[in-house]
Structure formats: structure tokens, C-alpha cells
Amino acid sequence: LPRIAILDGYPLENHSILANRLIIDDPDGLNQYYQVEDRKHGTAMCSLIVKGDIESRCPYIPSPLYVRPNPDDINRREFVPNDTLLVDLIHRAVKRMYEGENNEAPVAPSVKIINLSIGDPDRCFYHTMSPLARLLDWLSYKYKVLFVVSAGNVYNEIHYNGNEAYFKALNRQEQEVLFTTNILNNRRNWRLLLSD
């Protein structure tokens, strides 16, 4: 039985890391709209949960991963269709897991952790809980589930004003420190993503 769920892009089901480790629930028939090149993000996120960092020696999670694909658009950016409210989409997906839908049985009532990527670059946090945040709080309480919420993908470039040769000469750990410092120095522009 699945213990972890992800609401994100459609993965490649037969990827070497993911084969026989996923339970994909696609009640909206999104599979037909996802081409192979559109499945990179979903595959990467599912692989990260199932196996951890690809370079680490982490063991596979012991149970299958429940996957509820979300819509994607031709620009390959996460989005919610114009005729859908995000709160409705999330509510329907989670309720289907624990209570079922259309007189069907629940599809993943054993899930205790739900990974969700919901960044909205047009709506910054201003110290008031959004309707979606309230919904997640209520769903968490009602179904006794933990939501792991990612702020979403960052499409802005991260600029480095230093010398390219210097950067390339650094080892990986030094590059990561420089990269992270650069992000933290620019956090005023990413309030939604990085809190103080």
C-alpha cells in the first residue's frame, strides 16, 4: 500500500528507477496529452522520492508511490487550467484518495505524506493565509496527512556576476556554497520561495 503521494507532472512509468514502483491514478485521462519530452519533471520528482538523490546510495522507499498527475501546458510550465480553481483541483484529488469519487472506493487511503508543488509567482505571501493554505490545513487535519509543499519551479535566471573561469575552477561543494549565497542575497525578490 502506498504511504507517500505526489501531485505533480506525469512520469515515465517504465523508467529504470520507477518501473513497478508507482501507482498512477489518472481519472482525467491526462496521459494522452503528455508526450515523452513532457514527462521529465514528473519522472525527476518521482525518482527523487522513490530513490533519493541519484548519486547517493539511498535505498528505495519500501512501498509504491501514489502519483496523481496534474495538467501541463505546451510551454512545459506548471499551471492550472483557466476553467479550474486550484483549491477545487487539490480538494478533489485528496478527497478521491481518502473517500473515493463517483461511488468508487478510496484510491489511496493509506497515504500519510503528500508532496505538492504549487508555486504561484503572481501571488506573494502577505501574512494572511490563502484559501489554498486553509484548505491544506483542513485536509491535513481531516485525513491525518502531512503535506510537503514546494513553492514551485523558479523560471527566473540566477545571475552570477563573477568570473566564469573562476566558478568552473571551484569544486562542487564550493560552487554550491557560492550558488546558495547568491540565492540568499537575492531573497528579497523571492519572498514566496524563501522566508526570513
PLM feature segments, named:
Residues I74-L194:
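Substrate-binding/access-modulating region of protease and related hydrolase catalytic domains
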